[in-house]
């Protein structure tokens, strides 16, 4: 007869979201029994590793901006926070930026989002078409 281990939570997938959820559940209640079921135990071919991920703050919803800001702050100390003995996980994150384009029909909504982002100390700016063309000559009108 096989013995079974009862778990409070079983995470299906151990990518970024699965591992983060398990981590924060255990931070909230260290007595909780959490299991992560991941098809790629070496973490060499799972969705997080293979993604060309992007973190951004250009949202029109305050909560989304705050979540992104929190994630960016956590990345700064992630290797130290997740250290096990002398081993430190390697974080290969390179912050670059994004360029979002808006047509006249969506300009007011984009400007409202910009104001919200700036009110939350996001480093974002509005560029007019001529400024975009000067900074990014690959884009043509």
Feature map (PLM): residue ranges:
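Dinucleotide-binding Rossmann-like beta1-alpha1 core, especially the glycine-rich loop
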Residues: 52-138
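The feature captures the short pre-catalytic strand/loop hairpin that immediately precedes
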Residues: 141
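Beta1/beta-strand and adjacent pyrophosphate-binding region of the FAD-binding site
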Residues: 2-17, 35
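Short, flexible hinge/linker loops that cap or flank conserved catalytic cores
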Residues: 1-4, 28, 93
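Glycine-rich FAD pyrophosphate-binding loop
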Residues: 26-49
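A structure-centric signal for secondary-structure junctions around beta-strands
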Residues: 6, 31, 49-52, 95-96
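Flexible, glycine-rich phosphate/dinucleotide-binding loops
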Residues: 18, 43, 108
């Amino acid at each position: 007869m096989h013995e079974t281990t009862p778990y409070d939570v079983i995470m299906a997938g151990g990518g970024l979201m699965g591992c983060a959820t398990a981590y924060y559940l255990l931070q909230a209640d260290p007595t909780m029994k959490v299991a992560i079921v991941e098809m790629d135990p070496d973490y060499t071919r799972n969705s997080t590793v293979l993604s060309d991920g992007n973190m951004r703050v250009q949202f029109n919803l305050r909560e989304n901006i705050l979540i992104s800001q929190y994630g960016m702050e956590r990345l700064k100390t992630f290797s130290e926070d997740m250290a096990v003995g002398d081993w430190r996980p390697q974080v290969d994150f390179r912050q670059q930026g994004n360029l979002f384009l808006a047509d006249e029909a969506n300009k007011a909504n984009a400007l409202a989002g910009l104001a919200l982002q700036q009110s939350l100390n996001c480093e974002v700016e509005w560029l007019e078409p001529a400024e975009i063309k000067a900074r990014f000559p690959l884009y043509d009108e």
